[in-house]
Amino acid sequence: EPIELLTGPAHPLAAARTLTPAQLAGHRIWMPGNVAGTEWAAFYDDLAAAFGFTIEVTGPDFGTEPLLDTIADSPLLGTFVGAQTRFVWPADHDLRRIPLHDPTPVYPHSLVWRGDNPHPALAALRAHLGTIRPARETWTPKWAR
């Protein structure tokens, strides 16, 4: 799943229609709740190292609404969200979702199945997923390739 930058209206990148990951260099991306040693933390650490920005994990993780409130009010913090993830926020938040391209960072997902599962839909799903190719250049960490 492609990721996007989510910012408030006062963030320096808020007016961008799209960004490259390299354009995030020097910025702080707030990801509260990322726990060291998890695949999610490793993904974001590798992404930050590849493109020169900082992943900020400090602060409490009280859920989506407080995260959106903080991002809306901050001129310095942004966060990452999945392109397919839908949020509802108050209109006065004026949050901005900015796609990342060249390359597009994508969350690594895996399909795990049991070899003894004969369900025909599973074979059809695997065949379908094997035909999908991204329309743009993508970035995933080396350990997920």
Residue ranges of each PLM-predicted region?
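Generic structural signal for secondary-structure transition and capping sites
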Residues: I3, I29, L76, P134-E137
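Secondary-structure junction motif
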Residues: R17, P21, H27-F51, H119, ...
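Flexible hinge/capping segments at coil-to-helix
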Residues: E1-I3, T7-I29, A123
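Structured helix-beta-strand junction loops
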Residues: E1, A16, G26-H27, F51, ...
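Hydrophobic hinge/microswitch elements
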Residues: P32-I98
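Residues embedded in well-ordered beta-strands
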Residues: E4-L6, P12, G78, R96, ...
